[in-house]
């Protein structure tokens, strides 16, 4: 079944979401690694048994290992989808469309940044930035359409 432009956009947005999730979980993992050995000072509460500091460390290590596994899974999924998208993008015939897709989805640039990278050297860029961003939107629409065409050819 051929992908429609709507389905391709959803796929690209899902890829961005996957990249963001991977980045956030990797940051969380780094933070957890920095604090895994920290033991909180026990509070004395009469009549309550307190857990030993070793229990907290053991739980932290188990949580750290689980998060490491999750980050590795996300990284594998991201790499697979990156490769699949790159195979499609490299077959798009228009160089500017390829560049836009890579800037947006692989470099995670926002639209004004993309517009500046394409048109920032123009004399009227500052006053007409909105028009240049809109031009990028239109180019993106054509690029997604081109990706759908490429995908149909790859499947056939």
Please place each PLM-identified region on the residue numbering:
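N-terminal interaction/assembly modules
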Residues: 1-92, 119-124, 138-156
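Helix-turn-helix DNA-binding module
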Residues: 108-132
């Amino acid at each position: 079944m051929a992908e429609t432009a709507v389905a391709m956009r959803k796929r690209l947005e899902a890829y961005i979401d996957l990249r963001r999730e991977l980045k956030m979980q990797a940051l969380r993992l780094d933070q957890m690694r920095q604090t895994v050995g920290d033991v909180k000072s026990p509070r004395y509460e009469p009549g309550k048994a307190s857990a030993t500091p070793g229990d907290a460390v053991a739980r932290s290590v188990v949580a750290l290992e689980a998060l490491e596994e999750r980050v590795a899974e996300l990284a594998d999924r991201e790499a697979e989808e990156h490769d699949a998208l790159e195979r499609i993008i490299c077959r798009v015939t228009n160089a500017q469309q390829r560049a836009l897709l890579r800037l947006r989805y692989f470099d995670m640039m926002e639209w004004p940044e993309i517009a500046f990278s394409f048109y920032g050297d123009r004399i009227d860029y500052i006053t007409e930035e909105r028009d240049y961003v809109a031009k990028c939107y239109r180019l993106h629409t054509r690029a997604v359409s081109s990706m759908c065409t490429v995908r149909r050819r790859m499947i056939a």
